[in-house]
């Protein structure tokens, strides 16, 4: 969890690193450069301010791989005192953003992966949804591998269970190696690449909450949407992917007035408790489509995250996907490990 709380000296180091990254971007292929600028643009950050997503920040990944926990970073500070009053705990910084009782629910995670390699690079990148107590094992088979030469893509995954907020031992090669707070995370590894240094950057966004009642969920296979050039079609496809995970997973869900949703509080009684997106017409856009749930599948759904990929409404509508303007998806093969 290092880096969640940063001192002034740490910020100075990050500013220097950001300048180095800016210089490095100039050497990457034009496609990756454009995508990086798009994902890091002020418009993207501003559009996500009101959403349920906890993070929209590039994380460089070296050939040795990388791991980060899907813990709330930004907006949870707004209601940290509310979390403590509901769930108890001290006023330490750790307990200010993770309650000590109840459950951690990861609704879904989307990870934009941007390679920084030549078009002929033979390497592959594997993205896994893992639990930090066993960071080398994918949760529920939520793992996919793609060729670096195929370009940028978005990886979507979701677990089938809630995590109990408790301390648990870390397993490294089957042996205990300390104790941590249980959390979900994303592990990225690179193999076979001829590039040294940072091979890819990952941009994780996710929706999570801390309910006081646990639930189990339908299994939804992990998915990848390849991106060649940004246009409205791919923005539409990514949002369909998000809807698929948010609508098809729940088996049983007990909505609680004491449930806090990352990005905003879920106690707004002025809004309806059920917000379903309009049905998706698979023929409306070109490219590869992700099946949306039927009305029978979505019946009984108590909670749907209110935010779209860009802001409070779908990125497939109106001006909310301006920062995702562009894309023709490729039909590059994806190998599931």
Curated annotation (Swiss-Prot):
Q: Which UniProt keywords apply?
A: Host cell junction, Transport, Viral movement protein
Q: GO cellular component terms?
A: host cell plasmodesma
Q: By its UniProt entry, which InterPro entries does this protein fall under?
A: MPV
- Pfam families reported in the protein's UniProt record: 3A (PF00803)
Region forming the signal peptide: none
Query: What spans are recorded as compositionally biased (Polar residues)?
Result: 1-11
Which biological processes are named by the entry's GO terms?
Answer: transport of virus in host, cell to cell
Q: Where in the cell is it found?
A: Host cell junction, Host plasmodesma
Region listing for Disordered, in residue ranges: 1-24, 273-337
Q: Describe the function of this protein.
A: Transports viral genome to neighboring plant cells directly through plasmosdesmata, without any budding. The movement protein allows efficient cell to cell propagation, by bypassing the host cell wall barrier. Acts by forming a tubular structure at the host plasmodesmata, enlarging it enough to allow free passage of virion capsids.
Name this protein carries in UniProt = Movement protein
- Source organism per entry reads Olive latent virus 2 (isolate Italy)
